[in-house]
Amino acid sequence: MRLRNGTFLTLLLFCLCAFLSLSWYAALSGQKGDVVDIYQREFLALRDRLHAAEQESLKRSKELNLVLEEIKRAVSERQALRDGEGNRTWGRLTEDPRLKPWNVSHRHVLHLPTVFHHLPHLLAKESSLQPAVRVGQGRTGVSVVMGIPSVRREVHSYLTDTLHSLISELSPQEKEDSVIVVLIAETDPQYTSAVTENIKALFPTEIHSGLLEVISPSPHFYPDFSRLRESFGDPKERVRWRTKQNLDYCFLMMYAQSKGIYYVQLEDDIVAKPNYLSTMKNFALQQPSEDWMILEFSQLGFIGKMFKSLDLSLIVEFILMFYRDKPIDWLLDHILWVKVCNPEKDAKHCDRQKANLRIRFKPSLFQHVGTHSSLAGKIQKLKDKDFGKHALRKEHVNPPAEVSTSLKTYQHFTLEKAYLREDFFWAFTPAAGDFIRFRFFQPLRLERFFFRSGNIEHPEDKLFNTSVEVLPFDNPQSEKEALQEGRSATLRYPRSPDGYLQIGSFYKGVAEGEVDPAFGPLEALRLSIQTDSPVWVILSEIFLKKAD
């Protein structure tokens, strides 16, 4: 009995312990599941926060990259601005207080020189370095940029003739790979507007295509010239003229330097040879070294001087340092002297060293044609002796003829020499009724004719409103066939009272064409001037081809 009671108690205790163990395990298992759920939710929340942080980091990284690019761009612009480049940023120059050392509170800070150190008056106006006039497409990335400064002349302007010469000698490909920048270096708005409108009217295609640009400086670009000192025996007016000229060159170079690889300085009173642009490019590319600084394509003044655009900032800075002191050609020579001449060597050694930087091309590609200088009252008859003339086609011989003219011949430039292709014919101003006649020694048949008036040195001395006429030999039947077309009574060739038949006329200084075989043998050929001409006349080429 006592054993049974003990066994029962033991069994009861065991069951109670088992029940408590199961309850505790169940409770523990439930608590453990809750903890896992909590941890899982926290991990999910943490993952979401990490993903959001990653997205925010990417966003901030993009923003930082944009800011970095903006900083790089700003630094690049400032660096280009300091070197004289960055033409597009000039309008913001005066807004940067760092470019005004007198506004900086720290007096011990070092400041690099800028254009404002040499021309402090520019700080008075924000627009002082912005062109007052700018016409064109702003073309960049070309091989050659040609700069032409032009000022008001009291007697005659040669600018449009110069542009005609330069543009007419460019091939279509060259027109796509070059820019001509005309600087109207005057501050009178009426004058600059008139010249600009005239250029736009005469060269609309070139303006629209981007080949031609017209600019003029701000009236605030120039300093007060009344304070200049006379030097080298020049009167004050000449000192003012040469000083302003230096600044004109600087303005033009600063504007053009970011447009192309090479920059060519020209003047507004020149003519150019055919293929001048490709000749200059090839000469530059064929140089055995990149050490050259100036390639010269004319021996006169500042005409036909080619520079590498990368060198323009140095040249501009040097000119600005001494623009009041000496003319441009002296300053250019001084740059070369500073770069390569040894003061301990003699002048011959210096000249040899400078010859490596200043290389001359012959024959000259440009000729000076103006006689009235931009300096008031100055007459200059400068001619480049290396320029030469058009090559005459010696291989052709005109048929024997007696030549005569009613025009008054200038000096030794006779019609006989022109007909023999030894020189050109030059005569004083023609009037209506004047003529140039070629009477053949024996009647002959002509196949074609070609006449060119004007030449590269005097392109304006052309024949205008002039007809080409022939006089058939005594052959009534051939004349009748030539005068009529079918049964029509309308004249095919206008006939003059003295029997000459008009078969052609001059257009832009040139007359060419074929001769109708129906005329048969011809007795004479005549150039007949119909109206008075405002200029002298040059007949540079005469080509009469006999029929086989």
Curated annotation (Swiss-Prot):
EC number assigned by the record: 2.4.1.145
Mode of membrane association: Single-pass type II membrane protein
Subcellular location: Golgi apparatus membrane
Cofactor(s), names only, from the UniProt record: a divalent metal cation
Domain of life assignment: Eukaryota
Residue ranges that the UniProt entry lists as topological domain Lumenal: 29-548
Keyword list, A-Z: Coiled coil, Glycoprotein, Glycosyltransferase, Golgi apparatus, Membrane, Metal-binding, Signal-anchor, Transferase, Transmembrane, Transmembrane helix
Cytoplasmic side: 1-7
UniProt key word Mitochondrion: no
GO CC, alphabetical: Golgi membrane
InterPro entries to which the protein is assigned, alphabetical: Glyco_transf_54, MGAT4_A/B/C_C
Coiled coil: 36-83
Involved pathway(s): Protein modification; protein glycosylation
Keyword S-adenosyl-L-methionine belongs to the record: no
GO annotation (BP), single: protein glycosylation
Enzyme class name: transferase
Glycosylation sites noted in the Swiss-Prot or TrEMBL record: N87, N103
Purpose: Glycosyltransferase that catalyzes the transfer of GlcNAc from UDP-GlcNAc to the GlcNAcbeta1-2Manalpha1-3 arm of the core structure of N-linked glycans through a beta1-4 linkage and participates in the production of tri- and tetra-antennary N-linked sugar chains. Prefers complex-type N-glycans over hybrid-types. Has lower affinities for donors or acceptors than MGAT4A, suggesting that, under physiological conditions, it is not the main contributor in N-glycan biosynthesis.
Designated name of the protein: Alpha-1,3-mannosyl-glycoprotein 4-beta-N-acetylglucosaminyltransferase B
Record gene name: Mgat4b
